Structure formats: C-alpha cells, structure tokens
Amino acid sequence: MTERILEQSGLQPSLPRLYDEDDLVMISALQHYLFCPRRCALVHIEQQWQENRFTAEGRILHERVHTAGKESRRTLRVEYDVPIRSLRLGIAGRADIVEFHLQEGGSWLPLPVEYKRGRPKKDDSDRVQLCAQAMCLEEMLGCTVPEGALYYGEKKRRTIVVFDSALRQTVMETAESVHGLLAADGTPPPRYDSRCESCSFLPLCLPKVATKKKVARYLRAMVEA
C-alpha cells in the first residue's frame, strides 16, 4: 500500500527499502532535527535532556492526553497514546490521538491528532512530525491517510494539515538525514540564532560562547597573518 501511495504521489524516496527494528529512531528526532541538528544530536546521540517551562508544559499536556483512555461512538472511535512505526522510514513513536472515522463503505479512516502547548510554528517541524505519524499508520494499516490535525494549546482549536506530496517528500528526506546524523555519531557545532533563546538546551549548548570563540580565533588569525 505504501508503494502505491508513493507511486501515485510521484515521490521517489532514496531511503533503504526496510530498516531493522533495532535501527528505528524516534519520530520526535525528525522534529528536533528540523529545529536544530545539534539539538537532535544532543538528545539522540549524547542522551542529554534539558527541561524549561515550555518543555514542562508540553510534557504535562501530553501526559493528560495519553491517560484519557478510549472513546467510541457509532461513527467515531478514538484511541490515545497509539504506538506506531514505519520500517520503510526507519521511525517509531506514539501518536497522541488517532481518530477512526466511519466511511460510507464501512471502512474506518484514521486521522492522527498531535497536541502542542503553544501556537503554530513558522517552520514545518510540527507538520512533518504529524505527517510522519500518518505515513506510519499507512504502512501499518494498509490505508491512505490524507490529512491530520494539530491542536495548539494557546489557540485551543485544531489546525488541519493536508499530507501532500511536498510534505511527504520532506518527511522522507528528514528521516534519511536523521539516520545519517546518528550513523555519523557526531554532534554538529553550535550556531546561534534567535531560536536559541527559547530552546531548553541553551545552558548546555552555549551557542553564544562558541560563536564568540570562533570570532576571536578569526581575528587572531587576521592579526597573525
């Protein structure tokens, strides 16, 4: 089914055909990588974690969602904290919510819902994470998942995300990049930008210090030349 979906969408993945279970990476690693490859390496290579107010609020929100149990109606079934994985993409994780909507022919159409504490981000990291969940569900259930939803705590409403060809391609490319980063087993050097100020890893990463050292080395080299 996954092959048919890719063929219809015109995507040409360069990913290995199948990953071993032991080689799967967390879906959250894709989001970390898109935000900052160094952050991804700190979490998934060096096994570091730093929590601030934002990550704590996000963790509490997810814990509330995951303990909600199950919900069932005549045309809707809701599963919480659903384990998912894709051997093609080499990823695994847990979906906050998967809604199954009854279709006219009697089949159930899954719709993944991811909860976020803040507001929509300027980058695609949340959309990529959600689409990765959908591609896992497609591979596991042998169906097509055309869209999902992001629920942001500050807005208190859902944002529908359509899983088009471009977004799916980004998921595949990001998954491949994450596997490459982890296989290299090295942490990229820090690069400071405005996003660093809200990152929980700021005290550990120290991007400003590293940037100042680079400038100092450059000026020293210019003087000595």
Where on the chain are the PLM-derived regions?
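Short, charged low-complexity intrinsically disordered segments located at boundaries
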Residues: 60-64, 70-74, 160-168, 200-213
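Generic marker of residues within folded, mature protein domains
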Residues: 87, 138-140, 189
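Nucleic-acid nuclease catalytic cores
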Residues: 92-93, 100-185, 197-203
